């Protein structure tokens, strides 16, 4: 890229990466205001629909907007091998995202004012094994969730691959301040 920041007009989408392959995205860093109104999309090998489509902050595991703080008034931090998140200081992804022919990453500003986005996206041009998997991420939100109904996080995935994680966040309505019921269940193949 030729600049450390891009101004994204309200209601507009800009292209952050458009690279011919083969290659791999190796690291992404964003900072500044990265709230839910920024929508990141990633397309591999000229596909029509994105393999990744999510609010930028949610992609990095921050289910609430960037102003969310914990009980001590601090921003929650996610520190793992593949994601490092310190809201207000930076959002980092180290997931490798291979592509054979083309990688395209866009950012949409769904807000009502122009916003600056500070970012670095790095990778390498290299041969990619034919059987290499593509990176996918999805976003779901339901408010309110229907009482008594099972909430499905993800469904309909087919083919080989690895499930690497989920961010599940809950909020309460009214005076009820405790979420105490429910369990996470995962079904694979013919379960």
Name every feature range the model reports, one short phrase each:
Residues 1-191:
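Beta-strand-centric surfaces of beta-sandwich/beta-rich domains
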């Amino acid at each position: 890229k030729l600049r450390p920041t891009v101004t994204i007009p309200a209601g507009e989408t800009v292209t952050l990466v458009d690279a011919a392959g083969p290659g791999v995205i190796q690291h992404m860093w964003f900072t500044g205001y990265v709230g839910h109104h920024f929508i990141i999309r990633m397309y591999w090998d000229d596909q029509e629909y994105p393999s990744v489509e999510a609010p930028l902050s949610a992609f990095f595991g921050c289910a609430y907007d960037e102003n969310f703080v914990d009980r001590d008034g601090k921003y929650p931090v996610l520190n793992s091998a593949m994601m490092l998140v310190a809201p207000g200081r930076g959002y980092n992804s180290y997931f490798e995202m291979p592509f054979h022919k083309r990688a395209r990453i866009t950012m949409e500003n769904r807000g009502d004012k122009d916003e600056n986005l500070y970012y670095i996206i790095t990778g390498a041009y290299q041969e990619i094994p034919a059987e290499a998997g593509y990176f996918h991420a999805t976003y779901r939100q339901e408010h309110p969730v229907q009482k008594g109904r099972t909430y499905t996080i993800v469904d309909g995935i087919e083919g080989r691959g690895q499930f690497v994680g989920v961010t599940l966040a809950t909020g309460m309505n009214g005076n009820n301040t405790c979420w105490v019921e429910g369990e996470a269940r995962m079904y694979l193949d013919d379960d």
